[in-house]
Amino acid sequence: MKLQLMEIDAQTACVPARGKLDFLDLGFVNHCLLDIRLIGVRSCCPGGFSSYVLERNGRARGLGISLGPESGGECFLLEKRLRLRYEFISANIANYQLGPALFESSFLQPLPEGFNDGAFDLCLLDAVPIWQEQKSKGWDGQRLFLSQFILALKGVKRGGTIVIRLSRPELLYTARILWILDRVSQELRTCKPLTIHAKRPSFYAVAVGVGLGVEASRLPAIVDQFQRLWVELTFGGEEGEGRWLEDVDFDFLISQDDLIDTFADRLIDLSRSVWVVQTQTLCRLVSASKKQPTREMWRRTSSVLTCNNVSDAILYQTIS
């Protein structure tokens, strides 16, 4: 994980080497289960990303949130010599009250004392679910993503940076996240580290100057809408145990038609480096297997040519 952030930083300069730096690391909060009414959740504690930031910047101070061993999680992995500048909170982020201010539930806890709105210069979001078949629900991964995104939007300082792991930029779901980050930030860049992610659909978006973009005035309302959606994903559905994210749920950001009309070219610019890395990696894998790739094969295997969820227009521009 340390090598991944090193690659990202080398391309985007997202981790300053000097000056005061307060950061939030949810990158190792890997919950296999987000149903807050069940127990036995495992997680991997903050380590690699935090270690890189603390070593790079001697004035950096961090906050990491994850389950500890007493709750079924893993041991705290950060080097002991760095822990004086780091606060670790043993908790499940899905147990926090991430809905609107007036929403109440006996299942939820207030945000920890170490977390304050607008407190962090840098927010690192790399959480992915580790599934347990008998307990996890299909939408738990979507709830996990939304939970960490809400924490980042609330926690980042005006002018701060968000580094977030996403998947397949051509998907409507992902494209809308890229759109809002692009609109509320001064600069948005994408990066696909060769470490681990080269042949996977995952990549990272780095939003610099969050709160200084052309749509920055919308941020409070956007956070409120995400919080309302979080309640729906957590307690909605026919049985009141949550539901899947639907395409229309992000319409409050931008409609699909407007996204295509106004963001297609920008989306392709942001996605090109991601697609190039993955395509080159897949080419090497195919060459190593001594098989000749066909166009139809790339349609099935490469995210470069499987963007059928945004629009035919974006697909056409991407292939052309």
For each feature predicted by the language model, list its residue ranges.
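Conserved Class I SAM-dependent methyltransferase catalytic core
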Residues: 135-189
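Class I SAM-dependent methyltransferase Rossmann-like catalytic core
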Residues: 1-37, 55
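Class I S-adenosyl-L-methionine-dependent methyltransferase catalytic core
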Residues: 67, 71-73, 136-141, 177, ...
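S-adenosyl-L-methionine
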Residues: 71-119, 130
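C-terminal lobe and adjacent flexible extensions of AdoMet/dcAdoMet transferase-like proteins
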Residues: 4-16, 196-320
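Conserved proline-anchored active-site loop of SAM-dependent methyltransferases
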Residues: 42-43, 114-134
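Conserved SAM-binding motif I beta-strand of class I
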Residues: 60-68, 90
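Class I SAM-dependent methyltransferase "Motif I" SAM/SAH-binding loop
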Residues: 25-31, 40-47, 67
